[in-house]
Amino acid sequence: MHLRTNPSICPGRRPAWTLWMCSLFWGCIVSSVWSSSNVASSASSSSSVSQAQYEHHFHGSKHHSVPISIYRSPVSLRGGHAGATYIFGKSGGLILYTWPANDRPSTRTDRLAVGFSTTVKDGILVRIDSAPGLGDFLQLHIEQGKIGVVFNIGTVDISIKEESTPVNDGKYHVVRFTRNGGNATLQVDSWPVNEHYPTGNTDSERFQMVKQKIPFKYNRPVEEWLQEKGRQLTIFNTQAQIAIGGKDRGRLFQGQLSGLYYNGLKVLNMAAENNPNIKINGSVRLVGEVPSILGTTPTTSVPPEMSTTVMETTTTMATTTTRKNRSPPSIQTTDDIVSSAECSSDDEDFIDCEPSTGKSGGELVIPLLVEDPLDIPPIATRAPFITLPPTFRPLLTIIETTKDSLSMTSEAGLPCLSDQGSDGCDDDGLVISGYGSGETFDSNLPPTDDEDFYTTFSLVTDKSLSTSIFEGGYKAHAPKWESKDFRPNKVSETGRTTTTSLSPELIRSTASSSTGMVPKLPAGKMNNRELKPQPDIVLLPLPTAYELDSTKLKSPLITSPMFRNVPTANPTEPGIRRVPGASEVVRESSSTTGMVVGIVAAAALCILILLYAMYKYRNRDEGSYQVDETRNYISNSAQSNGTLMKEKQQSSKSGHKKQKNKDKEYYV
């Protein structure tokens, strides 16, 4: 029989390896996606918790806002460079700036802007006077509760006033005044602009009106006189001093002035910097920097949004003055904390007060959030001590747990914790394994599935904790754990943590106590049987609780001292009652779980592909061969041997020739 290998099989094996590699590759990708999704979900859950905490702190910080001034300037005067703020008291004050004798300006155009807040009906805010004997002046004042400006540059007093709305409402306002010759504009906040123009359009027009009534021979001298007078009508000559507060004129201003600007001079800033040309008299206080409650950044009475100077917001010509509505300050006045300067009163702008010297008058009253003492954290793994109410009395101290105390405790009434009825409590009851951790629980409380945030007892792992959650609780002292002195199934000496199981007698004795007074069970041994010591056990993972025969695992409470302040859900199984309360579950990381699942899925897929390939290749012909099914019958012995041999030789030659021809044809 002639067998030959078909070369077409080799190319057929390459796709199998390719599929195997592709399956492994896609399995890794799936596992990566799985792990990333798990990590994202865990991150979102953790971020939700942190967000809740953050929101809690945010609402808490709302009661500790930074002290702000009662009166706050709008955007036009905001910023550290915009201007200082002074408060003028009841008795009045004066800030006087005097130009040097050789540096007194004469101006054709003036710009004045100031922020203020007051409740007085009459008072002078700012007055600029020329040198003695000239009589030129410019005065910003409040009359009958309305703001106005009066100026005289050589002939008559020119008045411009805001008639629409009073400004002595205690709110903060910004007034802007511009003068160009005899033309003037006045604007308060973003209200409509008030304008003033002389009767004649130009000086020449006024001269032509007067020239008709003057004799011809006097025209020339009158023209020269009018031209000289015209210069006096447009120029504010030899300005000498700026008086702020009105005390020198007997019209006292009471309230707050901020960011005074006049022709490039920031007078209040200069006063705050102790400029030698400025004198301050009377009841005038500078609103200085108030330290922040948080102790991070200093805060002044002027909000930080004031970033533009008054110069940038003043108008120059009435015809081109346009104002947009200003947005209100981002910091709104609340009733939480209102602090202006150094006085604790709300109307200290008008009442004299002294700077705070540590007394109660200058203190900031900060409301504190006091939480309900009953709402203590569900799991306090690092709390050193929680004070017990006086009504709570200890029932058992685990540090003093001995054989005698355990035997006495076993006689007390305790509820049946097994799934069976009141008459069926036996050795199959639930084993309590607290390992002396100070866990307390209420057996009358139903087990819940949302112990992540609401639990019924506290867990102590590596520090002493005195705690009590419910009425009638006890004090538990858990010493610091170490792996070398930790024995899960041995009653240790005084001061050692212990682990026990509930005895059947103890369980049966109190099957019907759930409807009565809620008992409190300490996490410790309830019987006094001495068990064999076990080898040293590492805390992670915690050893499981054993029954009395130490051979069968029985639904332990899974705890982990490495989880700090992270309550987790209590795992439940069908048919098994858990101790209500919080218990921490040791979980693998999401990324590891996803990777393992992906690798297992990829391996299973590869195995299936290999099995399928083996099944296919098993049923496939592995080579080409030919079977000669011709039948040769033995002739009678009477026939000659020569004839038979010839036939055999011919048949063999013909068959070999056909085979050779077929092979040659096949390979070609």
UniProtKB/Swiss-Prot annotation:
Domain of life, per UniProt, equals Eukaryota
Q: Does the keyword Nucleotide-binding apply?
A: no
An example GO biological process term is: cell adhesion
**InterPro entries named among the record's database cross-references:** ConA-like_dom_sf, Laminin_G, Neurexin-like, Neurexin-related_CASP
Q: In which tissues is it expressed?
A: Brain and arteries (at protein level).
Q: How does it sit in the membrane?
A: Single-pass type I membrane protein
Q: Where is this region: Disordered?
A: 510-529, 636-668
Per the record, the major location class is: membrane
PTM notes: Processed by alpha-secretase leading to the formation of an extracellular soluble protein as well as a C-terminal membrane-embedded fragment (CTF). Proteolysis of these CTFs by gamma-secretase releases intracellular domains (ICDs) and extracellular peptides.
Q: Which residues form the signal peptide?
A: 1-35
Q: Would you name any one GO CC term?
A: membrane
Keyword line: Angiogenesis, Cell adhesion, Membrane, Signal, Transmembrane, Transmembrane helix
The Laminin G-like domain sits at 84-284
| All ranges on the Cytoplasmic side of the membrane | 615-668
Extracellular topological segments = 36-593
- Function, please? Neuronal cell surface protein that may be involved in cell recognition and cell adhesion. Plays a role in angiogenesis.
Q: Which family would the database say this protein is a member of?
A: Belongs to the neurexin family.
Write down what this protein is called: Neurexin-3-beta
Q: Which organism is it from?
A: Gallus gallus (Chicken)
Originating gene: NRXN3
